[in-house]
């Protein structure tokens, strides 16, 4: 998926997005297990405020139906049989989508839901991605500069 990413699997996606947006140049370093042919192979985290979070979850499900996602799962992330709480004291709702068709469109619709703080979609934010391969070498992917 070129330089579009899903980040925030550890639950710090709001903080990661703030840093990425403030940076002049974003470099992402990942190992080969994170490289996929299309977004959606990994769950998409969505950070939501605690208050009204069940209603926010319902709104997210409506968005996915509106955007014609047919098979999906929407669930609160759990840790020790409790809802996972981020560093910013929010909940994470994980979306299992299998394939994300239009990442920017999906982000725009999700972020418009009351209660959604941020999504783990990093669309057009990364400038360079360094992927560590199993043989110890690296693959470097750079954003094309406009000519």
Give the location of each predicted region.
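Conserved phosphate- and dinucleotide-binding cores of soluble alpha/beta proteins
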Residues: 1-147
């Amino acid at each position: 998926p070129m330089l579009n990413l899903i980040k925030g699997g550890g639950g710090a996606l709001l903080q990661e997005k703030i840093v990425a947006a403030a940076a002049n140049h974003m470099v992402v370093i990942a190992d080969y297990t994170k490289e996929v042919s299309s977004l959606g192979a990994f769950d998409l985290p969505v950070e939501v405020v605690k208050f009204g979070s069940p209603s926010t979850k319902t709104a997210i499900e409506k968005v996915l139906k509106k955007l014609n996602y047919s098979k999906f799962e929407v669930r609160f992330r759990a840790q020790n049989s409790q809802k996972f709480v981020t560093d910013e004291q929010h909940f994470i709702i994980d979306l299992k989508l299998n394939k994300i068709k239009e990442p920017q469109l999906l982000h725009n619709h999700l972020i418009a839901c009351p209660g959604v703080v941020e999504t783990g979609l990093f669309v057009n934010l990364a400038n360079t991605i360094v992927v560590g391969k199993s043989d110890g070498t690296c693959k470097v992917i750079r954003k094309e500069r406009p000519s």
